[in-house]
Swiss-Prot record:
Induction: By bacterial infection in the gut.
Post-translational modifications reported in the UniProt record: N-glycosylated on Asn-63. Glycosylation regulates ligand binding, specifically reducing affinity for the TNF egr, thereby inhibiting activation of JNK signaling.
Quaternary context: Interacts (via extracellular cysteine-rich domain) with egr (via secreted TNF-homology soluble form); forms heterohexamers when 3 copies associate with egr trimers. Interacts with Traf6/TRAF2 and veli (via PDZ domain).
Other information: The name 'grindelwald' comes from the village at the foot of the Eiger mountain in Switzerland after which the TNF gene egr is named.
Domain of life from the UniProt record: Eukaryota
Signal peptide extent: 1-27
TM helices/strands, residue ranges: 99-119
Gene field: grnd
This protein's name: Tumor necrosis factor receptor superfamily member grnd
Chief subcellular location: membrane
Any one GO biological process: positive regulation of programmed cell death
Intrachain disulfide bonds: C35-C47, C40-C54, C57-C77, C61-C73
Length: 241
């Protein structure tokens, strides 16, 4: 099969070829030529009759050198002339493929991140997931229970009567105020001693106190409290004219 009869296979998207014309190179590699015991490269070399050795095609096909020979290039290096223009195209295709691969990788990463974000939003809003998280938290951090077995950290208390019921320790005694003999004069008394009959709380053995008929008092008699029974009534007070 001749190299010239091979047609290049190509696939393009938007005018950019993705599969280079490699069928020509593959066919040429199968037609290696023997040059007096030496195998020449099927594309880049030819058997030069003058030297009986493999000679590079670039020397006779490059018009910028003094060894340029158009007839010899067309006869012996036809595969080289066909393949050489494709090198730049193949290089562009490789660069394009690398760029496409990079863009696809970035796109897949963005899609994966978006899917993960949507899944987390759905998972947080799911009631089953919230119940599962509450159970895990209750197992990891158990709340201390009260003496009667009720959990005060719970959202509800099942037995409200456990806090306030008849006969419980939480019941408070009612405050009581009793009237005594001095209440008529406007004195409010407590459970023990009327306000009007309270006396200084000094020790009677100190030198600053003097024993009196009431029991004890100050050295200054004007500071001694007069008992209620000895207070003069309104009838005995003389009226000044």
């Amino acid at each position: 099969m001749s190299v010239r009869k091979l047609s290049a296979l190509s696939l393009s998207i938007g005018g950019v070829p993705l599969i280079p014309s490699v069928s020509l190179v593959a066919a040429a590699n199968g037609e290696s030529r023997d040059c007096h015991g030496t195998i020449c490269h099927p594309v880049n070399e030819f058997c030069y009759v003058a030297t009986e050795r493999c000679h590079p095609c670039i020397e006779v096909c490059n018009n910028q050198t003094h060894n340029y020979d158009a007839f010899l290039c067309a006869k012996e290096c036809s595969a080289y002339k066909t393949f050489e223009p494709l090198k730049a195209e193949m290089l562009d295709i490789q660069n394009t493929q690398q760029l496409i691969l990079l863009l696809l990788t970035i796109l897949l990463v963005l899609i994966a991140l978006r899917c993960a974000f949507q899944f987390l939003r759905w998972l947080i809003g799911n009631r089953c997931f919230q119940k599962l998280m509450r159970r895990l938290q209750s197992k990891a951090y158990p709340h201390p229970a009260t003496a009667n077995g009720k959990d005060l950290n719970a959202t509800t208390i099942q037995n409200l009567n456990a806090i306030n019921h008849p006969g419980s320790d939480l019941e408070r005694a009612q405050s009581q105020i009793y009237s005594v003999a001095g209440a008529a004069e406007g004195s409010v008394v407590t459970m023990t001693t009327p306000v009007s009959t309270r006396y200084p709380a000094e020790n009677s053995t100190t030198p600053t106190t003097v024993m009196t008929e009431i029991g004890y008092g100050y050295d200054n008699q004007a500071m001694v409290v007069t008992p209620v029974s000895e207070k003069p009534s309104a009838a005995t007070i003389p009226v000044a004219f």
